Regions:
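Walker A (P-loop) phosphate-binding motif
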Residues: 2-32
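Ferredoxin-like iron-sulfur electron-transfer modules
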Residues: 27-33, 54-77, 88-106
Length: 294
């Protein structure tokens, strides 16, 4: 059954605004011209891949996490639960136990180890998942509830939904959150290959180096795509050479590409060089994963 699992390609970046979603949406649409593909927007705090596709909604569901609810009638104020919680989601304040849902990681320790069952777990909505279809392209996005602070659980449950429903799709594209924090690690953790998108500027190079450190710590095979090539210098190119990082493509800086993007349109159909870059990127990912290269 292993060979039925999709090739998972995560597209990430050290900072926002580098073109991560541009690459994700265009690569997914390019693949969908020939094969079934699922594009998953894991930037759950600000998903926007859906702006580029007008698809049929095929599934929608709310996502919940479990949090403890204090039962005052059972509680003996023994003080065990605050000591158990590493995240300080449960505290004792005088004659009361206070639960902070936004800090809770749903580990169940306080509930399971309470000697009088005074902290039963209850569901709390953290976001919503939607699944669309556009021809051979399936698009899944999750959106974090306003006021929620933890994206990791929602990202994890979104990936599980994809595993449960798209195990036979040949390729899955994960549009990851920007940066190098916990949500990025969760989004890329199961990826077979990670594409890091950067821009040829000092700021882009700085954040790329942080993303490279993260991927190496996770022991993920990865390569770099330089977007808006031509706006700055070649320091990013030199960095990739010095660090022996595969440079997968250089997408040119273009006013026309920016205009298409701002109108919610894909760009590869109008730019043969971009379409060729997408083909090269895909070939490299497939060859690297199948060949077992790091």
């Amino acid at each position: 059954m292993t060979d039925l699992k999709p090739l998972k390609i995560a597209i990430a970046s050290g900072k926002g605004g580098t073109g991560k979603t541009t690459l994700s949406t265009n690569l997914a649409a390019f693949i969908a011209e020939q094969n079934e593909v699922v594009l998953v927007d894991l930037d759950v705090e600000e998903p926007n891949s859906g702006l580029f596709f007008k698809g049929e909604l095929t599934h929608e569901e709310d996502i919940f996490k479990m949090i403890p609810q204090w039962d005052e009638s059972k509680c003996t104020l023994c003080g065990i639960c605050p000591k158990l919680c590493s995240y300080h989601a449960v505290i004792q304040l005088g004659p009361s136990i206070i639960v902070f849902p936004e800090l809770c990681h749903s580990c169940y320790a306080c509930s399971e180890l309470c000697p009088v069952d005074a902290l039963p777990m209850i569901p709390k909505k953290t976001g919503a998942l939607r699944d669309f279809r556009v021809g051979k392209l399936h698009f899944v996005e999750s959106r974090l509830e306003i006021g929620e602070e933890q994206a990791v659980q929602l990202i994890s449950k979104t990936k599980k939904y994809v595993d449960d429903n798209y195990g036979k799709v040949s390729i899955a594209i994960f549009d990851s959150p920007p940066g190098t924090s916990c949500p990025v690690m969760e989004a890329t953790r199961d990826a077979d290959f990670v594409i890091l998108v950067t821009e040829p500027t000092p700021f882009g190079l700085h954040d790329l180096s942080l993303a490279v450190e993260t991927m190496r710590a996770l022991q993920k095979p990865f390569g770099v795509v330089v977007n808006r090539y031509g706006i700055g210098n070649d320091e990013v190119i030199h960095y990739c050479r010095e660090e022996n990082i595969p440079l997968l493509a250089k997408i040119p800086n273009s006013r026309k590409i920016a205009e298409l993007y701002s109108s919610g349109k894909l760009t590869y159909q109008d730019f043969p060089e971009v379409k060729q870059s997408l083909s090269d990127i895909l070939d490299y990912c497939i060859t690297t994963v199948k060949g077992g290269a790091a």
